[in-house]
Regions:
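Active-site histidine-anchored catalytic micro-motif
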Residues: 1-119
């Protein structure tokens, strides 16, 4: 999502500031992780699916499908916002860091991310 986020931000960015990103949903999350090797994304999904399984007999919130309650739990583990420093007019992220929208539903819908820049 890094490039998509950058394309939507106003230009130029402030020399010094903070970018806050907030996703307005409860079954997806935002994360910063390695963006070079696509295997990281595959491994993260496998790890999360191992930690939080679908169709557990103790889930009570099941009316939206077997993937819904696990999606809410995964969302809570990750969080719905990120804060990224802006330095010299650029997002001050590490070489291998990228912004991820983590979709936890099996078939997620459209998602809205609110971006707020503080100078």
């Amino acid at each position: 999502m890094t490039q998509e986020i950058l394309e939507q931000l106003p230009k130029p960015l402030p020399q010094i500031g903070i970018l806050n990103l907030f996703v307005q949903h409860t079954s997806c999350a935002l994360s910063i992780n390695e963006n070079y090797d696509p295997d990281v994304r595959t491994d993260m999904e496998a790890i999360l699916n191992h930690m939080v399984k679908e169709r557990e007999p103790y889930y009570e919130h099941t009316m939206e499908g077997s993937d819904d309650m696990p999606a809410h739990a995964k969302c809570s583990l990750f969080g719905v916002s990120l804060t990224i420093p802006i330095t010299n007019g650029r997002l001050n992220m590490g070489t291998w860091q990228g912004i991820y929208l983590c979709e936890f539903r099996n078939h997620g819908g459209s998602r809205k991310i609110v971006a707020t820049i503080y100078e």
